[in-house]
Amino acid sequence: MKQTKARVFGNDPHFTEKIVSIFEPQTEVIRKGKASKPTEFGKMVKIQEAENQIITSYEVYEKKPNDSDLLVKAVEEHCERLGQIPDLVAADAAFHSPSQKAAVQEMGVKHISVPNRSTKNPVIRRIQKTRWFRKGQKWRTGCEGRISVLKRRHGLDRCRYRGQDGMNRWVGFGIIADNLINIGRVLAVHA
């Protein structure tokens, strides 16, 4: 009711607790800037992938966080689950934050492949053209393909359960199914 009153009587479409779905009130508006889908509805999901296309961590966020604040937490989760610091961390430009990159370097990560699209600094431009940096970005591009597979093969494009717990369960089942396929593929090669 508050949202309706603000829109109709107050002529204010910018309501902080905007409800976009009556059936799933926790649904959020997600703007990614894609030409084909400028606005999507749902929840933000962070996925971390290691070698052999195995997903090591995922998180379904209740409220969409700022991507640039997630890098250190992602590396900490990796260290906690796998017991070692990664040699290379790759993410898209939304994760760029000088303070986060510095903190990740202090943790012992050798190579951080997170592009800074807005920089004019020639040193940073040169780093972004190095072989290891480009390799990290190719890895990240492959991870985008993993997200597409999760959506198509395992139904992550639409959650069939209700509520935040249902969303966590649905995403978790999809990731478990995908990991089982990839683990089986790796074991078949080594058998």
For each feature predicted by the language model, list its residue ranges.
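Structured core elements
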Residues: 21, 46-48, 57, 90, ...
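Polybasic low-complexity intrinsically disordered regions
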Residues: 1-88, 93, 103
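A short, flexible helix-boundary coil/loop motif
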Residues: 153, 157, 184-191
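Hydrophobic alpha-helical scaffolding
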Residues: 34, 61-64, 136, 140, ...
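Active-site lining segments that contact anionic ligands and/or coordinate catalytic metals
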Residues: 17, 42-44, 86, 109, ...
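Generic, well-ordered alpha-helical scaffold segments in large soluble proteins
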Residues: 50, 74-81, 107, 146-149, ...
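Helix-centered, glycine/charged polyanion-binding patches within enzymatic domains
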Residues: 93-165
